């Protein structure tokens, strides 16, 4: 039996304007206590390209860059049971969502949600309900997602522009 996994605290600053919402951090991310800790995940390459920071900069610097651009990052799941890192391996009955009601109440300047992939959107809507602000699903930045990097970058760039 797999152990219960617990997600990470949100990355958010005062005046955040946009929430990027994933499903649950990967095994590598949880081990490093860093969002998108798998170097094959395109998240930091994409956000670095859009906001002008190095994708391989120290984690605190990357987080600071996102916060400076009004970007918050959090995941749908507070905890779950999952074998490996794939979203499809999460046991549905084990899913416990984060408290998004309290999150949005504490961060009223967030005006949009971007879901990082289908699992994040599906699980948010199933477990939490409709987001209180406009929301859009973007292609997953996961290495398991087969879309070409250039295509992912183009879609994400269009939605992240300041």
Segments predicted by a language model, with ranges:
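A polyanion-binding, active-site-adjacent surface
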Residues: 1-112, 118-147, 153-159
